[in-house]
């Protein structure tokens, strides 16, 4: 399912092929409910024109039935932003959340309150809505996503008292807790500046002249490399490169040998 909504244009798919005991109709109802939750709710304070709404997709794959209304799943979350002067969309987030466990009964309303943890499903969906908006805003203005990352962090803090996985530091090294914690950690501030430089000063300027923008992209990669050396294997850096790997190959295919050499030194 997809449509234009308030802030997000989110395609939602629920894949329940592995589930045999539950009526498949329940998962179509769930898909519709999530679609409406993501697309019709007002997540930001800004007014979006239809063509400005943030492109994203959530693919939820049900892996196990724990009971008649409790399911274990994983969710693939992807978001993109347009590149000025082109019809190309650049990926900002590409993450598979392997701890997407939730309760759902058919036609159960998806209730959510910013100030209170009501269910793991709506907490996870709201978390990703705010992360998607925060990343988008960071790509258009320096640290422009602060407000939305703080909202995502509030959800993490509220959900950490639940017994659901992915909200706590000891649940693993690649989860919801660590992603927003990395983003708001001052030692990773350079990465957020690099995201702005990469997109707004790099990609968005390439319609006019590729020479200067590609040097800015290379400087952004240098910042990421420096951060990775001081804080190796951080989730923030890993997710940046998982989103950008194919794009970087395309960008540097037309770069000068010297620029390619610099980029390779930062990427290896």
Language-model features, listed with the residues they occupy:
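Gram-negative bacterial Sec-dependent N-terminal signal peptides
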Residues: 1-5
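Second-shell loop/turn segments in exported
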Residues: 17-24, 111-119, 229-230
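Acidic/His-rich structured neighborhood in mature extracellular/periplasmic domains
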Residues: 69-182
């Amino acid at each position: 399912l997809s449509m234009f909504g308030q802030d997000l244009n989110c395609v939602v798919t629920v894949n329940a092929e592995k589930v045999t005991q539950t009526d498949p109709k329940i998962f179509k109802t769930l898909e519709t409910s999530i679609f409406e939750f993501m697309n019709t709710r007002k997540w930001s304070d800004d007014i979006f024109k239809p063509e400005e709404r943030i492109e994203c997709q959530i693919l939820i794959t049900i892996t196990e039935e724990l009971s008649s209304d409790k399911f274990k799943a994983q969710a693939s979350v992807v978001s993109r932003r347009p590149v000025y002067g082109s019809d190309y969309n650049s990926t900002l987030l590409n993450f598979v959340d392997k701890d997407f466990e939730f309760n759902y009964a058919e036609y159960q309303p998806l209730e959510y309150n910013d100030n209170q943890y009501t269910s793991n499903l709506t907490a996870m969906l709201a978390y990703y809505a705010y992360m998607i908006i925060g990343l988008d805003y960071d790509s258009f203005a320096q640290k422009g996503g602060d407000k939305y990352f703080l909202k995502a962090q509030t959800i993490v803090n509220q959900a950490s008292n639940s017994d659901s996985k992915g909200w706590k530091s000891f649940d693993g090294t690649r989860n919801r807790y660590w992603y927003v914690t990395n983003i708001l950690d001052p030692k990773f501030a350079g990465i957020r500046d690099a995201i702005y430089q990469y997109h707004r000063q790099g990609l968005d300027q390439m319609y006019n002249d590729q020479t200067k923008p590609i040097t800015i992209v290379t400087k952004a990669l240098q910042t990421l490399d420096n951060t990775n050396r001081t804080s190796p294997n951080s989730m923030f850096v890993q997710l940046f490169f998982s989103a950008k790997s194919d794009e970087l190959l395309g960008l540097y295919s037309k770069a000068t040998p010297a620029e390619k050499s610099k980029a390779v030194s930062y990427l290896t």
